[in-house]
Amino acid sequence: MATPMHRLIARRKAEANKQHVRCQKCLEFGHWTYECKGKRKYLHRPSRTAELKKALKEKENRLLLQSIGETNIEKKIKKKKRSKSVTSSSTSSSDSSASESSSESETSASSSSEDSDSDESLSSSSSSSSSSACSSSSSSSSSSSSSDSDSSSSSSSSSSSSESSSDDEPQKKKKKKK
């Protein structure tokens, strides 16, 4: 029920708002799109997918930079820890580490020989355990000079032997549970 009065009021409001309206066809202010008589101007605008791809690339780059920074920090911390552990293990005295490694090799030889006797069928599961079992059985069956040579070879690399023997012991415990 638009009376002529309502139409007049609506036209006046539209005329007042035209000054702030941009035509979507020619991109000029002052008239509505349906009133436009000009041609459509070309305005280069990136597509929505291109904008989304740019945003994703920026996020990935930020994450990569953050992860690279974090890994560099972690590497520095690990290097510091390694250098501290190496210096502390080397300063602890090489004689005590050699005697500890020889006693560890003798105890591991006796335990691994028991394992090899009881579980010969499972010895093929890990080459390191089978080689240690073979060397331990040969050292236990042969004279003490061979075990002395084993301990001297293990004492030559004291830091690596102490780390490897500590790593081997939990594996042997797992085998006993099976």
From Swiss-Prot:
Q: Does the keyword RNA-binding apply?
A: no
What are the residue ranges of zinc fingers typed CCHC-type? 21-38
> What is a single molecular function from GO for this protein?
nucleic acid binding
Give the keywords, sorted.
Metal-binding, Zinc, Zinc-finger
Q: From start to end residue, where is composition biased (Low complexity)?
A: 85-113, 121-164
* Chain residue ranges for the region called Disordered: 66-178
Record has Zinc-finger as a keyword? yes
Question: Cross-referenced InterPro entries, in alphabetical order?
Answer: ZCCHC10, Znf_CCHC_sf
| Entries under Pfam families matching the protein | zf-CCHC_3
Q: Per its record, how is this protein called by name?
A: Zinc finger CCHC domain-containing protein 10
Q: Which organism is it from?
A: Mus musculus
Q: Which gene encodes it?
A: Zcchc10
